């Protein structure tokens, strides 16, 4: 009987440590920074690399880390009761042509799906909703604006009774467009649909991981929760066999202390 093959380590052939690669991808995707901004910030912390290395790592590992985050979150969301989705589309210019970025957000601000199309017709809306329903299951209510493509698509899918429309009813998803707009300006817009689709999916996963609903929790709860999310982001992807798991246990032990930069300091120290 053949022995089961272990999954290949994606960090092989890279001289930099996995901790640094995770930190670089997290900084570029999470914050509205350019490639050279990330290069300068890392240089101030003793990590010397080129901005093109940031581009390479983001393209290579961004989708991998995003898939890891999505895999951990999707299974937990399927059992939600009274689940409401908010659907909306935003215009994004690619090489002078307008494209539509369809986005689905639930009532708690979790970005569920992102989908790029050239049109806003019934076929585009149907493809977007099929993709979201296949991955996340069916919600209790679906809130949309007055675009007739949604109604036609829901008639075809047989869930028109779940649709809700109304003034200000879709503010949840419209407000969630703002981080994407800020990131679009930092990247000097997009040049291909494929790039926009990839970035929208990766950005949504990282946004969900770090979204703590800051306006709903007090400062102390926020401080205790923030290092744990950072530690989780720095463990994305398969861990190399040479990595000491006790090192991450030491980090978790210190999470309850008011030392919020502990993990980043250990990452930088590991590269010194």
Predicted feature residues:
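Intrinsically disordered, low-complexity basic tails/linkers immediately adjacent to helix-turn-helix/homeobox/MYB/SANT
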Residues: 73-97
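C-terminal domain-tail junction helix/linker
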Residues: 186, 197-262, 269-272
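Short, basic alpha-helical nucleic acid-contact segments in DNA-binding proteins
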Residues: 56-77
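Mobile genetic element proteins and their domesticated derivatives, centered on retroelements
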Residues: 24, 38, 54, 88, ...
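Short conserved beta-strand segments at catalytic cores or DNA/RNA-binding microdomains
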Residues: 32, 95-111, 121, 129-132
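Active-site beta-loop-alpha junctions of metal-dependent nucleic acid enzymes
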Residues: 60, 114-135
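Helix-centered, glycine/charged polyanion-binding patches within enzymatic domains
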Residues: 146-205, 211-212, 217
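Basic, short loop/linker segments at the boundary and entry of helix-turn-helix/winged-helix-like folds
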Residues: 1-29, 33, 46-51, 55-56, ...
